[in-house]
Amino acid sequence: MEGSDFLLAGVLFLFAAVAAVPLASRLGIGAVLGYLLAGIAIGPWGLGFISDVDEILHFSELGVVFLMFIIGLELNPSKLWQLRRSIFGVGAAQVLLSAALLAGLLMLTHFSWQAAVVGGIGLAMSSTAMALQLMRDKRMNRSESGQLGFSVLLFQDLAVIPALALVPLLAGSADEHFDWMKIGMKVLAFVGMLIGGRYLLRPVFRFIAASGVREVFTAATLLLVLGSALFMDALGLSMALGTFIAGVLLAESEYRHELETAIDPFKGLLLGLFFISVGMSLNLGVLYTHLLWVVISVVVLVAVKILVLYLLARLYGVRSSERMQFAGVLSQGGEFAFVLFSTASSQRLFQGDQMALLLVTVTLSMMTTPLLMKLVDKWLSRQFNGPEEEDEKPWVNDDKPQVIVVGFGRFGQVIGRLLMANKMRITVLERDISAVNLMRKYGYKVYYGDATQVDLLRSAGAEAAESIVITCNEPEDTMKLVEICQQHFPHLHILARARGRVEAHELLQAGVTQFSRETFSSALELGRKTLVTLGMHPHQAQRAQLHFRRLDMRMLRELIPMHADTVQISRAREARRELEEIFQREMQQERRQLDGWDEFE
């Protein structure tokens, strides 16, 4: 691909992402499916803007590489050792059982046994990029099902090595390709990478950080990620596995958060590129000529993997409420299938359209996962949000919740405990299924699901409640929920958490006057204590705190019309000077009034 063509492709990718992803999110089908549909639209079987899919697909695998590096940063070696049973137990069982079942089914459709074995192994793998992205979206990272899912994905990355080595053996060309000397050299090189990374990475980054130049630190981080990926690729191993190991080696270093910050923007863009490339690779010609075969194969693939994963989760002791999440998120085929099937095709293991059929099956199975997870969410919502007992009656006056609390993280838990301590009837809405299980044990009335769904709010008693407290982590979710409540439940008193001044402006513009900036009150309290340590009388420090709170809120309201204006920054500076002048003037009037306490407003 020439330079101008590469630039044009980049512009097309960005345009497709900007156009498709917001639309997909608005339709409620998720960003991942939006990327896939965008890829179909601009690919060779869509509008035909881009035809060199293989080259772009190979480049876009860097998105998975960056993602695995960040995941490695979140896992220290001791944590990885704790996962050994799930990695080599559940992970190995999933690959072997799924591969055996799928290979047997492929043999029934006129695949040779060699091609069926390769096909079964390739289909048994899941998409690391899609599964990890969905697990993050569903907040499964810290749950039991999320940890187990990650273990399975990690074993699949490890299984890449023997799977690729198996292809020439099945093709009957082992003598030409199976060189024990080369294998020994690769093992030594891999061990050398581990030892070198263990003892050299931290001193190198310490030296780079001492320069104080942020751009150099970012460049060094990119060099580490791309270099380790290239090194592993040269050894014939998984690039993602190499960067994951590099991340683990730096997980306990003092540079962990800085490394993650430097990599995160690249990871997001390249992951989007990967999903677009997968959409582009969908062969609509094969789909059209073999429609029935492909549809049946996608259904069978997803069903077999869900069955195997669900049974393994049950044997492993995963909670029943989390088994379907675990099975659903790993039910698709994966990006490794593209590599394995291409290698097998070069060894002439496949006949006719067999490779194309398998690749179409993998691509379509990846497209079903976001939709499948939405169905799983609805099923879990019915399971958790139905009557707790069969003879439970509809709401009566004494059972109606007075307050609905959306989100039960650390912020929401404090509010919930305060309300419960004062005998208030509350209902909690939470998207983290592990938190739902835990809160139910403590006697909270908790509903699982997305609070931006009107039906869930009704089920939770929004029509009978007096107030709703919104403590979402994401500002977009907060504003969407405010809009829904104002439209469908206008009687509710809306109270919201604002993560900062910008979100506070947005809430005020939306008509929400009861909100709390999560760091503002605690910062004011610490400031009051600081004034006391500097010799100010406690009563005077309290008044200073109250005046500052009142005047800051006034300035916040005055700046609402300028929230999106280009002169906002200069006006904010003027407001700060006015605030200081008014504050000093009013405090001088209060200096001799050292007794009495005002109330917070």
Swiss-Prot record:
The chain crosses the membrane at residues 4-24, 29-49, 55-75, 87-107, 115-135, 152-172, 177-197, 207-227, 230-250, 268-288, 291-311, 324-344, 356-376. GO terms for biological process: proton transmembrane transport. Its main location: membrane. One of its GO terms (cellular component) is plasma membrane. Residues 400-519 form the RCK N-terminal domain. The keyword Transmembrane applies. The keyword Oxidoreductase does not apply. Keywords: Antiport, Cell inner membrane, Cell membrane, Ion transport, Membrane, Potassium, Potassium transport, Transmembrane, Transmembrane helix, Transport. One of its GO terms (molecular function) is glutathione-regulated potassium exporter activity. It is a multi-pass membrane protein. It is found in: Cell inner membrane. Belongs to the monovalent cation:proton antiporter 2 (CPA2) transporter (TC 2.A.37) family. KefB subfamily. NCBIfam families: 2a37, PRK03659.1. Pore-forming subunit of a potassium efflux system that confers protection against electrophiles. Catalyzes K(+)/H(+) antiport. Interacts with the regulatory subunit KefG. This is Glutathione-regulated potassium-efflux system protein KefB. It comes from Escherichia coli (strain SMS-3-5 / SECEC). The gene is kefB.
